[in-house]
Amino acid sequence: MAQAQIDEQRRLQDLYVQLKKEINDGEGVAWLFQQKTYTDKDNKPTKATPPLRTTSSDLRLCDCNKQHQHNQSNCWMCGNKRSRRAT
């Protein structure tokens, strides 16, 4: 029992380290908003994921990247410090 708990804890720690590495090597949390494609049973693409829908007033188009959205002068995804864009 104790060995199984140790193995599970080690596995979770390894997954956490892998996640941190992938986020640091990528674009921060921007990977959460990347568009994915649907695939059929033959693993062939069928159509693009529908656009992200939100009612949050904090999200608007960013000058730096049209794939993510925000309403802040400091873009938390890409570090863009330019003023916000009117929508």
UniProtKB/Swiss-Prot annotation:
This is Non-structural protein NS3. Plays a role in viral DNA replication. InterPro entries: ADV_NS1-3 (IPR020960). GO terms for cellular component: host cell nucleus. Keywords: Host nucleus. The lineage of its organism: Viruses, Monodnaviria, Shotokuvirae, Cossaviricota, Quintoviricetes. It is found in: Host nucleus. Its main location: host cell. Pfam families: Amdo_NSP_1-3 (PF12475).
